[in-house]
């Protein structure tokens, strides 16, 4: 495209930052809906439409979202298996003036999703990083749980094997509300383990399919909620909100 210059006191000020590479670009971290597409913000759509490059965890999954909102910008795969190899090239593109937007399959990148590495490298390089407010699964689950939400700790996915018992042991004295992500296939096993470590009467809320048609929160003691999901096979994305240790 053409570059417009404005003459001002013998200085030329470029009005097209990206095209002439006068300044460094920017990294936008853009949340995407965890369920209902209506949860996409106007600003998120605008940023994605204006980006020179969109980094997507899975280009096929994100392709559906982008097509829905008529976003046709260049997209590149960026996930935990390739981010160590691609991050340097992306940082260099931003340094050269490109605007890059990072999205994950659902929710806010970096929260139990790829994103930390590219953000850290951009910060190290002096690149401006802006994270848009938006969808993330654990906040609605926490607020709707009925458990104390003024202080909480987010644990994400527990280690599957090595370090799992150590992590659970370290949380036995935790007084804040705890938040975990889990797959439906491991839910009952994890809740049963919680009962062993935290006591069967500990209050819990299991929220699944957040912002989708079959959204559901099941609340009660660990014993009660284990019984429910033993009889009713859990499906969909799961957030476990567990009460902290009482004084």
Give short role names for the model-derived ranges.
Residues 14, 20-22:
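Cysteine-centered motifs
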Residues 177, 181-247:
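A contiguous loop/helix-start segment that scaffolds small-molecule binding in enzyme catalytic cores
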Residues 87-136:
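Glycine/small-residue-rich loop that forms an oxyanion/phosphate-binding "nest" at active or ligand-binding sites
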Residues 117-174:
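Class I SAM-dependent methyltransferase SAM-binding "motif I" and its flanking Rossmann-like core
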Residues 5-8:
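Short hydrophobic targeting helices and cationic amphipathic motifs
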Residues 78-83, 158-159:
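Conserved helicase motor
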Residues 23-80:
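Glycine-rich, flexible N-terminal cofactor/catalytic loop recognition
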């Amino acid at each position: 495209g053409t570059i417009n210059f404005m003459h001002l006191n013998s200085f030329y000020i470029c009005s097209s930052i990206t095209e002439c590479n006068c300044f460094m670009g920017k990294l936008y971290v853009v949340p995407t809906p965890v369920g209902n597409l209506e949860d996409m913000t106007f600003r998120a759509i605008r940023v994605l439409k204006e980006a020179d490059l969109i980094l997507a965890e899975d280009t096929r999954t994100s392709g559906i979202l982008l097509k829905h909102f008529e976003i046709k910008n260049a997209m590149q795969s960026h996930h935990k298996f390739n981010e160590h190899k691609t991050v340097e090239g992306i940082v260099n593109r931003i340094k050269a003036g490109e605007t890059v937007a990072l999205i994950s399959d659902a929710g806010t990148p970096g929260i139990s999703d790829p994103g930390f590495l590219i953000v850290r490298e951009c910060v190290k390089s002096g690149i401006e990083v802006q994270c848009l407010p938006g969808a993330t699964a654990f906040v609605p689950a926490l607020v709707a749980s009925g458990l104390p939400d003024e202080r909480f700790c987010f644990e994400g996915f527990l280690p599957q094997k090595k370090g799992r018992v150590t992590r659970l042991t370290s949380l036995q004295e935790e007084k804040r509300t705890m938040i975990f992500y889990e797959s439906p296939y491991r839910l009952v096993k994890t809740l049963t383990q919680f009962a062993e470590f935290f006591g069967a009467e500990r209050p819990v809320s299991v929220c699944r399919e957040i912002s989708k048609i079959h959204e559901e929160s099941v609340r009660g003691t660990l014993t009660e909620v284990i019984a429910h999901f033993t009889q009713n096979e859990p499906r969909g994305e799961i957030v476990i909100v567990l009460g902290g240790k009482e004084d």
